[in-house]
Amino acid sequence: MEDRLTATGARRSNPISGPEQFAEAFKVPRETIHGLIRYAELLTEGQTRANLVSTKTLPQLWDRHFADSAQILRLAPDARVWLDLGAGAGFPGLVIAILQANHANFVMHLVESTAKKCAFLAEVARATSAPVEIHCMRIEELSKSATSLKPDIVTARALAPLPHLLELAAPWLKSGARGLFLKGRDAGKEIESAKRRFNFTCHLHPSMTAEDSFVLEISHLAKRVKAKTR
């Protein structure tokens, strides 16, 4: 299988400063915006108890975190089963779950090993009726029972360099799931490094929220087989 790399998509010029701009940009109904507003409130409150996100990013919450997460949905609007690895404070998984709450049979699996963050995710899910299942464990533990979980999409944000990320996601990507991973300015270098371990198809979608960032769409993952030497 040959590696294939393409770049598609367009960036949005104006940052999203609040719920009204978010609703306009993503065509979101009022009740969904109310859920995101509640999420924002709980995140601000929770930040005083646990280090959920970088405090300096809170003033740009709607653009830096919410819009950055929501942009992934345009690449898989009909996917019903998602898996967010290293969910942290819920980006991108919890945002997508809130946006898709009214879609039948939708579920977002959130994997997070830190108990305080799991408690926060559960609090937001209750407050917003987000269709999520929280797995408070290490990704490696969940992957041992990977056959019982069959996601359409595997996603992650700021979790690990791509070679390690693909190792973590491999149990699901090798079973046919697509990967949608948010990456920054080093995306190209990470792809080249990952190619030393894996064969895969990769589409680069320019981020809507940052000029030097991308969404990597990865499929057809297979481990590279080293040629035998005589």
Tell where the protein language model's regions lie, with residue ranges.
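A short glycine-rich, Lys/Arg-flanked "PGG" loop and its adjoining helix->strand segment in the class I
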Residues: 166-176
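Active-site capping/gating segments
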Residues: 134, 184-230
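Residue-level signal for inorganic ion chemistry
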Residues: 43, 96, 183, 218
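Glycine-rich, phosphate-binding/catalytic loops in enzymes
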Residues: 92, 171-173, 197-198
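Short alpha-helix immediately C-terminal to the canonical SAM-binding loop
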Residues: 117-119, 162, 187
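Class I SAM-dependent transferase core
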Residues: 2-79, 83, 116-131
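Conserved beta-strand signature within the Rossmann-like core of class I S-adenosyl-L-methionine
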Residues: 176-186
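Conserved SAM/SAH cofactor-binding pocket of Class I
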Residues: 70-156, 166
